[in-house]
Regions:
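Aliphatic-rich helix starts adjacent to a transmembrane/signal segment
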Residues: 2-64
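Generic detector of short, locally flexible boundary/turn motifs and exposed helical patches
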Residues: 11, 21-25, 44-45, 114-116, ...
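Secondary-structure transition/capping residues
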Residues: 39-43, 70, 162
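Bulky hydrophobic/aromatic packing residues
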Residues: 40, 54, 80-81, 87, ...
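Conserved long hydrophobic alpha-helices within structured protein cores
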Residues: 57-65, 145-152
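Short, well-structured beta-strand/strand-turn elements
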Residues: 64-74
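Type IV pilin-like appendage domain
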Residues: 72-143, 168-170
Length: 181
C-alpha cells in the first residue's frame, strides 16, 4: 500500500497565518508611528529647553557679573531701583563696568530674545522658538540691599507650517538675579 505524501498546508493553517499577519501588521505600524510622534515631541522639547536655558543663563551671568546700574532710558538719565521703595518694569537699560549700555528685548516674529547695545545685537534664542510673553523688572527689598532683577518668559516651539500637537512645546522660565554691590 502506498502512502499519500501530501505537501503544502491545509486551509485552516493558511487562515490562521493570514489572521495572525492581519492582526500583527496594523499593531506594528501603530507602534512604529507612535514612536515617531514621541521622537518628534522629544526633539521639540529639547530645542525649547536648550533655547530657554541658554537665554536665562546668559541674562543671569551678564546681569550678575557686569551690571553697575539700572536705568529706565537708554540715555541713562533716570536710575531705577536705587531706593527700597522704587520698582520698575521693562524696558530696563543696564550700565556695565565698561560704561556701555545694554538691554534685553524680544524682537521679530517669532519673538526672539535679544541682547542689544548701541552697536551690537545678539540673539539669545533661535528662530525655531518664540519667547513670548517676556517680562523684566527690578526692585529692592530695602535701601541697603542690592537691586534684584526678575526675568520672566515663556519659550514656545515655533513653526509657521504645522499645528500638530506633538510639535508644540512650552516651558516657563523665571528667575531673580541679585546685583553685586
Amino acid at each position: 500500500m502506498k502512502k499519500n505524501k501530501r505537501t503544502g498546508f491545509t486551509i485552516i493553517e493558511l487562515i490562521v497565518v493570514i489572521g495572525i499577519i492581519g492582526i500583527s501588521i496594523p499593531a506594528i505600524f501603530g507602534i512604529f508611528f507612535t514612536m515617531l510622534r514621541a521622537q518628534a515631541k522629544t526633539y521639540v522639547l529639547q530645542e525649547v529647553k536648550r533655547n530657554g536655558d541658554n537665554a536665562i543663563n546668559i541674562m543671569e551671568t551678564l546681569i550678575k557679573q557686569r551690571v553697575l546700574g539700572i536705568y529706565s532710558d537708554q540715555a541713562l538719565t533716570t536710575e531705577v531701583c536705587s531706593t527700597s521703595s522704587s520698582q520698575s518694569s521693562g524696558p530696563l537699560y543696564f550700565k556695565d563696568r565698561d560704561g556701555a549700555v545694554f538691554y534685553f528685548a524680544t524682537e521679530n516674529s517669532p519673538f526672539q530674545i535679544a541682547s542689544r547695545t548701541d552697536s551690537l545685537e545678539y540673539y539669545l534664542t533661535n528662530q525655531k522658538v518664540s519667547a513670548n510673553p517676556f517680562s523684566i523688572q527690578c526692585f529692592r527689598k530695602n535701601t541697603f540691599s542690592p537691586p534684584i532683577v526678575r526675568i520672566d518668559f515663556d519659550v514656545n516651539s515655533y513653526s509657521s507650517t504645522t499645528t500638530r500637537q506633538e510639535e508644540n512645546a512650552k516651558i516657563h522660565y523665571t528667575t531673580q538675579v541679585k546685583l553685586r554691590n
